[in-house]
Structure formats: C-alpha cells, structure tokens
Amino acid sequence: MVDREPWKEPHLAASGSTSMINGPLAPHRVSFAKIHEPLDLPNLLALQIESFDWLVGNDAWKARVEAALAAGRTDVNTSSGLEEIFEEISPIEDISGTMSLSFRDHRFEPPKNTPDECRERDFTYSAPLFVTAEFVNNTTGEIKSQTVFMGDFPLMTEKGTFIINGTERVVVSQLVRSPGVYFDRTVDKTSDRDIYGCKIIPSRGAWLELEIDKRDNVGVRIDRKRKQSVTVLLKALGWDDARILERFGEFEAIRATLEKDHVHTQEEALLDIYRKLRPGEPPTYEAAQTLLNNLYFNPKRYDLAKVGRYKVNKKLGLDLPYTQNTLTEEDIVATIDYLVRLHAGQTETTRNGRTVIIETDDIDHFGNRRLRTVGELIQNQIRLGLARMERVVRERMTTQDIVAITPQTLINIRPVVASIKEFFGTSQLSQFMDQTNPLAGLTHKRRLNALGPGGLSRERAGFEVRDVHPSHYGRMCPIETPEGPNIGLIGSLATHGRVNAFGFVETPYRKVINGRVTDQVDYLTADEEDRHVIAQANAPLNEDGSFAEERVLVRRRGGEVDYVHPSTVDYMDVSPRQMVSVATALIPFLEHDDANRALMGSNMQRQAVPLLRAEAPLVGTGMEFRAAVDAGDVVIASKAGVVEEVSADAITIAADDGTRQTYRLAKFRRSNQGTCINQKPIVDEGQRVEAGQPIADGPCTQGGELALGRNLLVAFMSWEGHNYEDAIIISERLVKEDILSSIHIEEHEVDARDTKLGPEEITRDIPNVSEEILADLDERGIIRIGADVVPGDILVGKVTPKGETELTPEERLLRAIFGEKAREVRDTSLKVPHGESGKVIDVKVFTRDDAELPPGVNELVRVYVAQKRKITDGDKLAGRHGNKGVIAKILPEEDMPFLEDGTPVDIILNPLGVPGRMNVGQVLETHLGWAAKSGWKVELNGQPEGWRKRLADIGALDAPPNTLVATPVFDGAKEDEIRGLLENALPNSDGLRMVGPDGKARLFDGRTGEPYPEPISVGYIYIMKLHHLVDDKLHARSTGPYSMITQQPLGGKAQFGGQRFGEMEVWALEAYGAAYALQELLTIKSDDVLGRVKVYEAIVKGENIPEPGIPESFKVLVKEMQALCLNVEVLSSDGMTVEMRETDDEVFRAAEELGIDLSRREPSSVEEI
C-alpha cells in the first residue's frame, strides 16, 4: 500500500542534489529550476517595516541610510518622517512676529506594554512621543526650552502590523497619481481636431491647467475656476507683450492668443484674474497679488513635494533644487513652452544642454503612479493634527501674557492625538488584518490599493485604470487582484519589487555589458526601464555569460516584443518569478494555467484554513520557506547555539556568545478570522541550531515551510454523477483520520456595567434557573475550562436590576431588614449563540482593580470556545490552480475506487472541470506528485541527452519515496521530464508500478471489485480546505426577531432571521395553485401578528390551526395611502366595513401565557428573543 503516515518526515533527497532556492536552512526540495538567480528574494515585509522605520527615524533606518550613502546612492531620504514634519511646522509665529515656537529632536520612550499584553487587554501598542519645544521671545531674545509630551504613538510590531485596542490591523499602501506635470491629448468631437491640455498637480494646493482649444487659443484654468487667456497669467507675473513675443513668438497659438487679449498691464491682469476667481468681491491690486501668491507661490499653501519637483524637473528638463517645493515662474514658462511645442507637432527640444522628448503622458503608467506607504500615510495624518494644533497655539499666543508663556502652556496635543486615533480607527486604509493563514497576512501587508482618501472610487474608475499595463512588469502582479467591483484597483506587490525614496516601485535587472550578462543588479523605475532593451530571465546563456542565441527575445518600451542582436541588449530579468506576487509564485506549473484561474488560485490560497496537522506540498515552487518565515508565524532562532530546554510553550537556546534566550510560543490563540494560531517546537534538546533556522512551526507551516493543505491521492473520473458541475467526492478516511479537520475558536464577552438602577452583577445566583443548568459554572458564575457547551448554555451568569414600582410598606420593611437581597433583577447572562458549540478552552476576567476598563464597566469576562470541525458535505475545497468545488458526497473507504495494490483514492474530481477552464497545471501537478510520492531512479544508459541530461545537470537522477520537489513558476519541470520520472518511478513493496508513463492507472470499482474499462489519471494533488465552511452558513429559525415597521421576520443568519419567500417564489406557488401553503407563508409565518401568536398557542395546546388574519404589511399600506390623503376603507365580502383593530387583549393574554414578548422593539441580540 502507498505509505500514508503523515507524521513521517519527508526524506532528504540524494546528496549534492540541487541548487537551494529556499536557502540552506529550509527543508530540502529537489528543484527543477534551470536558471541561476543572482539575487535572493528581499524581505517580503520590507514595504511596511522600512517605511515605518523612516517615519520614526530609528536605528535600523539610520543604518540603512548610511549603507546607501556609502554605496553612492543619492536618492535616499536623510531626514526621517517626523523630523520633516516638525521642521515644516517650525516656527509657529504670532501675527506680528514677536514670538515663535519651534520643535526639534523627537524621541520615544519604551512602550508600556508588550504586543501580547496589548492583545490580551485591549490596549493599543504604542510608545510615548516626546519632542523638544523652544519658545523664543523675539523682542527680548529670551528662549524657553521644554520637553513636551505629544501623545502615545502607535508602534509597528515586528510582523508589520499595528495593535489598536487589542486588534491587529494593517495599514495598506495606497497607489495614487504622482504630483507633477501631465500633458494629454483629446479629440474635439465637432471639428475632429486634437486638443492638447496640461495639468500641474501638486501634493497639496491648487491645480494649474492649460489647454489649447480648437481655435488655437491657449487658455489657463486657475484652481478649477473659469478659463482665461494664458497671456493674462503671464502679464500678471510681470511680463509684457514684447517679452511674451520674444519668448514665444515662433508659435502661432501664442500669437493668436495675444492678439485676442484685451489686458495690457500687470495690474489689469491681476484684477482680471481676481474677478474670475472671486466673483462678487471688490477687486484691489493688493488682494489680487496676495491671492495669486497664496495659490502657487506660498510654501504653506502649496506643496509639490520632493517627488513633484523631481517629476516636473524631469519632464520639462529643469534643474531646480528638490527643496523648491512651490511653483516658480520658470516652471510656468517651461510648461507653456512644452505645451505649444507639443501642439506644433515637435518631438524634441533642448533645454539646459539636455534633450527633452516632447510627448503626451500615460496616466496609468507606473512612472506616473506612486505608492503612499504606511510612513507617509501616518505622516500626512500627523500633519493634519499639527496644523490644527498650530491654530490653537496662535490663538493662545495672542491671549496669554508674554512673560508667563512656556511651551507647555501654548501646546494642546489633543488635535494631534485625535488625528492619529482617527486614522488608525476609521481610515479606509487602516484595515482589520486578514489572519486566516500566514499567506493571507503576508499578502495583506503587501497590498497596493488605488481606493481610499485621495485615490479613485470604485464607481468612477474606468477600464483603463484597472487593466494590466506593461509598466506593471516586476512591480505589481498582473494576476493577483480580487474578482468583483474592485478588480484591478487592488493589486499585490511583485516578489522582487521595492519602493524608492520618491514612492515609485523599482524592480531589479541584471546589467548586460557588450552582450555579456553580469551579476551586477540595477533597480529601475518604470520611467527608466522605458529607455532600455531588456531580455527575459530564461534567455539561454553560455558559460561566460554571453547569449547563446544569435537573436535574443527582448521587450522594449510599451511592452513591444522583438528579436535583436545580443550587443543591443541593456539588461536582463533577474528571475522568472519577478513579475508575479508571492501568492501567485506559490502556484506550481503556473505557466500552464489560464490567467483567470490563476487569479482564483492566488486568492483562494489566502482563504485556506489552518489544519490540525499541516503538511507541506509534495510539489512546491521553492517559495514556501521564505513566504512562511517572512510572514512571521514561524519562530526563528536569532542567534546560533544549542537548544537547552523545550516545552510546548517555550524554547530556550544557549547561544554561542554565552547568552540565553527563551522564545515563547503562542498556544491556541484566536486569529482575527476565528482560526487557530498554535505554534509547536520542531527542535529537540541538545540540538544545534543556526541563526535564522526555524525552531517552531506556526499555523499552516511544516518544517518552516508554508503548508496550506494536504497531499491527497486523486482520481480524475466521473462517479455516478455525484461530482457533476465541480462537486467533489471524498473518502471517509479524510474524516476518520482528521486529515482535513481544523480548529476554530470563538470569543464571547460580557461586561458588568453601572446602570441607572444600580450595578449589574456577575453571579451564579440567577433567578428562575435550575441547578442542572448551572452545573458547569464555578462559584463566581463563570463556566469552567474544559466544559462542553451547546447553543443556549450559560457561559457567564449575570443579573441586571429591574425597574422598580412603588414599594408596599411590607416590602419596605423587608428591604430594611434584609438589605438589598429582595431587589428585583432580571437574567442577562451570556449564553452560547445559536449554531455554535464546542469546548471552553480559556476564560479571562478583568476587574476595575487590575485593568484599565472603559468608563462605567466594573468587570469584563471573555470566554473562548473552540470547536474541532471535521470535513463534511457542503464544505468548499480547492487546489492551487483555481480548481474549486463543494463536497457533494463522502463515500466509505470500501466504496472508493482503488489501485491495483488495494489503495483507495482519497478524492475524485470531475475530468470535465479541466479542459474548459484551461488550468492544465493541476494535471501536471498530479503526475509529478505521484513521481515525488513514489520516488524515482533514472539510469543514463549511456544516452545523456534531452531530459536525462537536464535531470543529471540538476542532480536529480534518483530520489527516495516522499521526496519534496520544487517547480518554480516559468522555470519548472518540463513535460518530458515528468514523463521520464513516471517511467522510472520506484515500484511499491510488491514490485508493482501502478501508474504508467502516461500518468494513468488501472482503477477498480470499490463496490464491485471490477476494473474500470479505461485507465484513469491518478496522482497526488495539494488540496486546501477553504474558510467557507457549511457550519457557518447553516441556519434555522422557528420564531425570532421581527422588523419594527412591517412585523416581518428579519433576514440573515446574523440577525437570526427567516428565509425570504420573495415575489418570484410566490408566483411559483401561484402557478401550482398551492393556495393554502401560500396563504400560510404570507400571513401566519410572516406578519399576521394575531395569527402567529394564535398558531403558536394552538400548536402548544394541540388544537387545530386557526384561520389567518390581516397581515401587518396590509395595515402599513392602508396607513401610507391615508398619509396621501386617500380615504381607504376595508370592506368584507358582504360589503360591511372591517374594523382594523390594533392587537387585541386576547393576543396579549395568549402571548403572556406562552411567554412570548410582543413588544415591537427589535431585539438587540439573539438571546433576547
């Protein structure tokens, strides 16, 4: 039989086997990669961590800056984000300039709590920020300096997340249009002429737009207001007609505009502009001058930012310093010059001794879109807060006595703290972290989002913005993006991409010198890449690095493909997986999958639930190790040493430098999505470990490698039609042996508050509850750990004081004698919600004395309930190729088709799901999976050519059973290699080779033992269990909450709602003439308030079901018609007026008897029904 033991360690492959893609500390995989990669993968969380390091200016950032400067790079930020912002706001001066306040030297104190404490106690992981504030009295020269507390500043954890009020959040990077100058061309619909326009877009401030219309007039639009002649703007800047003609006289458009211009002096021009911008206000020369200055030339109001200045300089061929953050006259003149040259049909000009190419811009090009990473997003938010604080400081300067003023009395930090809180709590870009598995978290942190404040909106984004663009190559993955309304607006950073100081994404290339490829790596932005000719990573090379072929396949600007002579090649890709994201790079044989299915495969890997026993894929891509380690769910040894002590929740290592380090492991913690985070040691006492080696596995990892699913024996065949339309049949073995079982943890919490009638109390003493129900509660009224609970069970007993009526003298006497005991309370205990059950694994109690609780809360109790969910029909399974389906049937092992040696298959997939979907990768994975499971031994037989030679070159001529293999994307195993491995697969213990070289096996029907007439494809495929579990979707209701107005049941599982019987369903029953069933559905099962109570009563008492009454929605309709002043009367069949009474006494009597609450408020929770 095929070896089944999941805990058996995968064998190491034959010694000297292959190049290590994963690095020396990873489990060994036989790699089919043929391409030498000169560059390791960068740290996959660098996007988040390096950006935040820059913001706070910590030691790691300083070290990176020093290293970059030493390497001769000029494009690095030498001041941190917080430094920039405090420099920007300093000095704050009062109106007369007699005093000023400035800030410098920010520093952080150590955080008060560890990340784990913050998670447990609902705190924010933050550190106090202090800054030195200097107050200068300019008249006396006196300086007062103080260290001022600027609030608690949220810190990033090592994993690139923030912990805000106890929950892990991720700040997603935003893709926005870069500040700069953009030229575009549109076609006029009436005259069919080209209209050229241009926009100067700042980081903040007013836009300046220029346009040459169909009559060849050059117009300007200031701050999105009415269009004016461009010569008016030039004259407002102090130019006269002669100077304009001297500079632009060669261009017909400017001459035509000047002729039509009626303004002659600077003053007239300024007043003209003022009238158009501020209609209705009396224009004065000073006001007009100030207005124009404030719009474009005042650094407080207008900011191009460094990146904007860089783009403007680059586009227009200027040499202004990066510190020049406002517009200049030179910018405006150069822009006009460029626009009229573009209109005149010129293609290039020289400026400052450089050739400037004249062309329109593509707004979707990655040279014109930049990333606002975490650091910049938070920096912008602090800038807002400081601007609000600045206003307060100015006010206080004027009101306080100048002698008594100190920095502390001027500063109010509330607006700063509030703006940071607001960003982390409510911004669209601060998101609840996706923690289903390590890959989900990693991808979430590498996400690029074009939505959000200052970005696009779903509704307005057109097809062009969403489409794949040639400049995405190596920067943003063309495959991984959501399906649905956000398609193309949310992407994922490519594996090798990095962000430069200006926020543009760069990707690495190997330099090619004189037709020879070197190992020198240059990072290029999308703009720089356009100027070069680039070869693919798989271009064949000779030993000396020269190209082996006479014509090399390259790509040029705009995605054009061409064959050229090797000497004209400038660069070469560093790696075949350079263009895809991490999730996509985990799909083996990606090159054989249709892109739509690959997209689903990438997205579904993020929904895989951590299983009870993780198993690394037999067929991987070599990315598994880095993905798991960088995601941070694997524990890594920080120093080399010897393991001293190992327990389930801690590992102690004695390092070589004499220090001891203890690593604490997370045990059965709940993730944001309710999956289970559990780490387990994978080292033994006395074992030697190296720095960077995994010492404990986390969820979805095995041996430090990402392990999202299980390797299952699959047969592609139809079975009695049960796997029709993507349905899946699985063997009962997967249920029995917990192969696809997972643990899910739910958190339930209850708090005891102060109410107007007195404090709530957590107690075991609950009114009208039997001792039997309280059996599992301890003396405090809290459930014991280890108790099995089902829906409706009490987790925490709690009573709330009831409203009191006037007391009788006897009651007052009792109250006086016995104190508070006789007070009326009602049961408001925390109960297990419908549809949930499991085992209590943890209870946390917080009281006012030992924890900071919100105001009004005296005690807080959290109960964690875990459930083990076995795989069941209705659960969703998927492979890595977008091949997804729902389990339709679980067959006993003895009924499953079996191989010649009696091994039953685990899972049956429909072969018709493959050709139409064009994801053939799953078939190749199946065959290679079989070869990897069986092992192989290839004899050269004196013919080392073709696939045998290739296998010999990578040292993979033999491998024992259960060998892990890697087939990297675009550089994996070829079809002939897989065929060869199947031919040479090792036989089983009986000497049988069950699968032929075509990958097919003879299968037998488990029910009859007869062989199937045709051979069937059999092999091992990696299957994941997705988060869409049937237990979470199943829902039932008899009675429950009703809507306040219509009195119809609410909808949805969350509201404990009913099943909607809609308009079309009503038609269906009408068509069958099922009148009584329909009447029942529309009245007593829905909104006939009287009827439904009477029916309940009749069922309880065993009587006949009464006639339905009038539905509430009919009464609502009548009321609405009356509101339209229509006199509506309801007549019976004999013409008598029907009285529409409100719910009568009889109903209330029956309801009270049956314990049904008829009050019309909507219950706030399921328990109150």
UniProtKB/Swiss-Prot annotation:
Residues 1-20 are annotated as: Disordered. Gene3D superfamilies: 2.40.50.100, 2.40.50.150, 3.90.1100.10, DNA-directed RNA polymerase, beta subunit, external 1 domain (2.30.150.10), DNA-directed RNA polymerase, subunit 2, domain 6 (2.40.270.10), RNA polymerase alpha subunit dimerisation domain (3.90.1800.10), RNA polymerase Rpb2, domain 2 (3.90.1110.10). One of its GO terms (biological process) is DNA-templated transcription. It comes from the Bacteria. GO terms for cellular component: DNA-directed RNA polymerase complex. Its EC number is 2.7.7.6. Pfam families: RNA_pol_Rpb2_1 (PF04563), RNA_pol_Rpb2_2 (PF04561), RNA_pol_Rpb2_3 (PF04565), RNA_pol_Rpb2_45 (PF10385), RNA_pol_Rpb2_6 (PF00562), RNA_pol_Rpb2_7 (PF04560). Residues 1-11 have a biased composition (Basic and acidic residues). Keywords: DNA-directed RNA polymerase, Nucleotidyltransferase, Transcription, Transferase. InterPro entries: DNA-dir_RNA_pol_bsu_ext_1_sf (IPR042107), DNA-dir_RNA_pol_bsu_external_1 (IPR019462), DNA-dir_RNA_pol_su2 (IPR015712), DNA-dir_RNAP_su2_dom (IPR007120), DNA-dir_RNAP_su2_hyb_sf (IPR037033), RNA_pol_bsu_bac (IPR010243), RNA_pol_bsu_CS (IPR007121), RNA_pol_bsu_protrusion (IPR007644). Belongs to the RNA polymerase beta chain family. The RNAP catalytic core consists of 2 alpha, 1 beta, 1 beta' and 1 omega subunit. When a sigma factor is associated with the core the holoenzyme is formed, which can initiate transcription. DNA-dependent RNA polymerase catalyzes the transcription of DNA into RNA using the four ribonucleoside triphosphates as substrates. This is DNA-directed RNA polymerase subunit beta. It comes from Acidothermus cellulolyticus (strain ATCC 43068 / DSM 8971 / 11B). The lineage of its organism: Bacteria, Bacillati, Actinomycetota, Actinomycetes, Acidothermales.
